[in-house]
Amino acid sequence: KMNELGFEVMHVYGLTETYGHVTQCAWNDAWNEFDEEKQNEIKARQGVRYPNTEGIAVMNPETMVEVPKDGKTIGEIMIKGNVVMKGYFKDKEATSKAMDGGWFHSGDLAVMHSDGYVKIQDRSKDIIISGGENISSIEIENTLAKHPSVSIAAVVAKPDDKWGEVPCAFIEMVKDKPVTEKELISFCKETLAGFKVPKQVVFCDLPKTSTGKIQ
């Protein structure tokens, strides 16, 4: 739709603590040969290091070792450079934790592709642990967002006696395009592993901030 309107969209990534964006999904002309679905998949990545940033890496936060560039192994995005904050105001403990190992710990979980492009999978605090399996809430949200009746999706952990936690989806529907809980669960089963499929779907108007982010 954006292409039809003549807009060229580029994904960038950054945090308040890094004074602007530190990666950008710079386009490679060779990708023009790919079909639209593949191009959109690439455009969803956060990208490669921006020139004003000294270092971007995806690491195991426990060992501070970079994860394999296989597009599958999840680690935490680490950032280094003079664009990174000095620390949190009057909070030495939080500063020490965030800067452990000489890198800023973003709290964003991501994979690194073989071409050096980063793609976020989830926030570390939003990972759902179900029966010992780590589930990305973003992966489920992105799947639900592909359904024509879904306007916005938010997935959270729901306590479960058997599995500890299970995914629960909150859905804001597209006007005049009704859909049932059963239909959305079946839709998710087409592409997601069984343990990742939401066990409950709640339809509601999702609360948002003034900038449109889901609260």
Predicted regions, residues:
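Residue-level detector of family-conserved "landmark" positions at structurally sensitive sites
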Residues: 12, 53, 154-155, 199
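Extracytoplasmic/periplasmic beta-strand context in beta-sandwich domains
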Residues: 22, 199-200
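AMP-binding/adenylate-forming catalytic core of the ANL superfamily
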Residues: 81, 86-87, 97, 109-196, ...
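Conserved AMP-binding/adenylate-forming
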Residues: 3-12, 16-117, 124-127, 140-141, ...
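General small-molecule cofactor/ligand-binding pocket signal
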Residues: 10, 201-204
